[in-house]
Swiss-Prot record:
Monomer. Catalyzes the transfer of the enolpyruvyl moiety of phosphoenolpyruvate (PEP) to the 5-hydroxyl of shikimate-3-phosphate (S3P) to produce enolpyruvyl shikimate-3-phosphate and inorganic phosphate. It comes from the Bacteria. One of its GO terms (cellular component) is cytoplasm. Residues 1-20 are annotated as: Disordered. It is found in: Cytoplasm. It catalyses: 3-phosphoshikimate + phosphoenolpyruvate = 5-O-(1-carboxyvinyl)-3-phosphoshikimate + phosphate. This is 3-phosphoshikimate 1-carboxyvinyltransferase. Its EC number is 2.5.1.19.
Amino acid sequence: MIMAKPLSSRRAAPLAGSAPVPGDKSISHRALMLGALAVGESVVTGLLEGDDVLRTAACMRALGAEVERRDDGSWRLFGRGVGGLMEPADVLDMGNSGTGARLLMGLVATHPFTCFFTGDGSLRSRPMRRVIDPLSRMGARFVSRDGGRLPLAVTGTAQPTPITYELPVASAQVKSAIMLAGLNTAGETTVIEREATRDHTELMLRNFGATVRVEDAEGGGRAITVVGFPELTGRPVVVPADPSSAAFPVVAALLVEGSEIRLPNVGTNPLRTGLYQTLLEMGADIRFDHPRDQAGEPVADLVVRSSRLKGVDVPAERAPSMIDEYPILAVAAAFAEGTTRMRGLGELRVKESDRLAAMARGLAACGVAVEEEKDALIVHGTGRIPDGDATVTTHFDHRIAMSFLVMGMASARPVAVDDSEAIDTSFPAFVELMNGLGAKISGDNP
């Protein structure tokens, strides 16, 4: 039986210092997968060594690639070339990683062998039909639990069919799964997205040598086309700090009076920075120093000072660029003066937990006035410090856990989370980093 790891967060003194945020989770997954498909050696530095990404590394080994961590902390991959993956001898256990599972399903769907996927209880409850449907149209066969849930078996096709597929919901994971399947497919595979989603797959594929076209789609949006059978060439990849992980110390510094922190080398891809745009609209003092390009991705050093925030209306169309950041935005909204309305959040219902419900319940327990709607969260801030004094159920969701630990840093009384184990999936050093800046997070009872 897995033992829970409760944590408590107490009101902090002003936060100060510089802290390295871990590598971007989305880019880390993709670097391992494309390095495994490339011809020759790829060296990845800055890889996120959280559980989700380590599961992907283990899966790429199981599929025949050479993957090793070097003494200097970098990762070396020697790939098998497009179409060269091998049938794994065992089940691919994705743990809690929805990104890893969906992208790998695309990767193996156009290889002529069978793979078995499983995951933890949370992942086994998440919908996979959105990936299964387009990959089936390309020729892959699936056997799954009801609703397309894990565990499932994928039998790839030896003669995949290129498709043009319009995403029914904005999803970078589904888009990327189809593009990865398209690499080992003759001709051109096209994904149409009406709302732009994070484009790390497109950027990294080009960086490895694939032909990827991004054009305006008829009727609006973008058409992304990948040309099959490219010769991907091994190359160095530098993974920037994850803007989704940086969100937690950023919001903490905004809320704890007198704080000033610096976060170096944070990814600033415009399709990932919706939270930062929203915080600036709320009155946040965030500076983006030394903007630069790093292996095809924009990065900057973030300087954050404590700020008085005001409530705002967050447009629904911003959701794809900040879908993982709504929990921590809701915490910021709880300290703001005025009402913050967040809409277009239906996708939060099928994340690691029902994040919409989890945030509403947690905020209410901390004394915050909040309304939960079908696809919206409305937080009524008063400009006063929330009471806190609650233990929040995380539902084994790393972002729920970290969000409420940040809340405890600025609330009148401590906030505890019932289990912090899931934090290791994306931010293993979270407690150490936050306490190093001045937080008071511990395993003691509040």
